[in-house]
Amino acid sequence: VLDGLVFLFSAVDGVEPQSETNWRLADNYKVPRIGFVNKMDRQGSNFQMVCNQVKEMLGSNAVQIVLPIGEEADFKGIVDLIKNRAIIWHEESMGSTFDIVDIPENLKEEAKKYRGLLIEEVASYDDNLLEKYMEDEESITEEEINSALRAAVMDMAIIPMICGSAFKNKGVQFLLDAVC
């Protein structure tokens, strides 16, 4: 029995031919999925590019639920758009320890934009949440977002996109938490 898939994409190479083949198989068998963009610490990595490729090349509704903090060798954390906070990994522990902090000042506007897009997208799959979104977007809770997101993923309407670096254990625990 297969309940769901984690699709792994390279932050440098993006969607590759084998990704397309496996994606079509998952579509045929109606398997819900989540995307993990790996190798964010590599030169030439680009989370946004990969998310756009997943949308365009695979015809999916890829929705970012995180934003990267730092690029390439300076990749050090993520902004969790659901909880509206940042996670910064400790280099010396190879990502096994981290700090939860406020969103860095230079990412606040971008985080607000992408959180709004995330809420708008999941609200379109939940009538109660859509009504609340129209009245007061700020009053929507983490639990409401998670519930609507889960329903949309199970209906294969949304593909949540996460980024990290598996080699350095950055984003792996976040991915595991997202799957559960």
Task: Label the model's feature ranges.
Residues L2:
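An anion/phosphate-binding loop that grips the pyrophosphate of nucleotide cofactors and donors
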Residues S10-C180:
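P-loop NTPase catalytic nucleotide-binding module
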